[in-house]
Amino acid sequence: MSKSLQAIRGMNDILPDQSPLWRYFEGTVAGLLDSYGYSQIRTPIVEFTELFKRSIGEVTDIVEKEMYTFQDNKDSLTLRPEGTAACVRAVLEHGIIGNGQVQKLWYVGPMFRHERPQLGRYRQFHQIGVEVFNLAGPDIDAELIMLTWRLWALLGIQDAVTLELNSLGTSEARARYRDALVEFLSQRIDQLDEDSQRRLKSNPLRILDSKNEGTQAALVGAPKLEEYLDEESRVHFEGVKARLDAAGIPFVINTKLVRGLDYYSKTVFEWVTDKLGAQGTVCAGGRYDGLVEQMGGKPTAGVGFAMGIERLLLLIETLGQVPESISRTIDVYLCAFGEQAELAGLKISEQLRDRLPNLRLAVNAGGGNFKNQFKKADKSGALFALILGDDELAKQEIGVKPLRGQGEQQNIAWDALAAHLETAIAQA
């Protein structure tokens, strides 16, 4: 017997009962980004593998272990593991950041990494990301953080997240620090875990955020990144902090925050929570002033962030912040009894859609007696059932029956129905 077909491990279906929360979240974020003047960009989910090697770095965990890569004739292609590289490729390819042209962009979609699936971590996961080009000052760094702070308030999770902040300095400052860190840790290499020993040669800054207790013990007394910061980065970082203070946004300086991607510089930040166990980062980003040039463009300031949708939805549910209204997908359910009533019901329903474009109206399909149709109306979650039979037809009325305890049934004239429903739904 053949094995039943199932979704790939770590790649999940989003079912109808889950979709309202996704739509609510994505709609809330999109509306907020629109209000800040950001424009949406959409890029393919498949890119040439070389794009990610050049942007993320060949000796990162993502490129070495986690990418879904395959051959297409002579080309090596990869399912995107993150969104920044594709966004940079797109703005370069289409020439929309030349001559200092400012672009404030956002995107939403699936990303792919071959990781061990666990709560809040999947092989196909979804992100909303923001990228800004040709703005080099601390004001735009602060704006991105303020934008996310406002989003947390809209979602009801502001009290459950903490902002961690750091500065990585310029590439020259990081190079000086990297040399000092390697020299320090080389004398303690036997105390480092296997991953950290490998990173000592390829990406030593990543050792700072190792979760291994032995490695953390080896880091005691290690040189600190802030001691190697250049003056430009120091002034920039002070500017970011001053703006956050002015906006009343609390933050914690985390000198071990380095981010997992090679292209970051100067400001880096993460929003973390202690409500989701090990998967505590729900949003992360920072500045990447060298990335556009690294990918073949002119020197261009860049800054952005990405937030994990699955983790944020899990946090919203964990905190009980799912709005009650989004669980209802239908406002009104129309029940019609008899062929003439069905025909009249179709006409009435389309007139209602003309008058009330936002009305969520379901018309019974498949016939059925009163008990059967009324049961379906109740099960739909609608606030009201519209009842249309021979008696109502004769009087050109329709019965409006509350389904959620909002009073008694009323018979309403057809020409007054739209106004009645608009008021009744608003009050329900």
UniProtKB/Swiss-Prot annotation:
Homodimer. It catalyses: tRNA(His) + L-histidine + ATP = L-histidyl-tRNA(His) + AMP + diphosphate + H(+). One of its GO terms (cellular component) is cytoplasm. One of its GO terms (molecular function) is histidine-tRNA ligase activity. PROSITE patterns: AA_TRNA_LIGASE_II. Belongs to the class-II aminoacyl-tRNA synthetase family. The gene is hisS. It is an enzyme of class 6 (ligase). It comes from Pseudomonas entomophila (strain L48). This is Histidine--tRNA ligase. Its main location: cytoplasm.
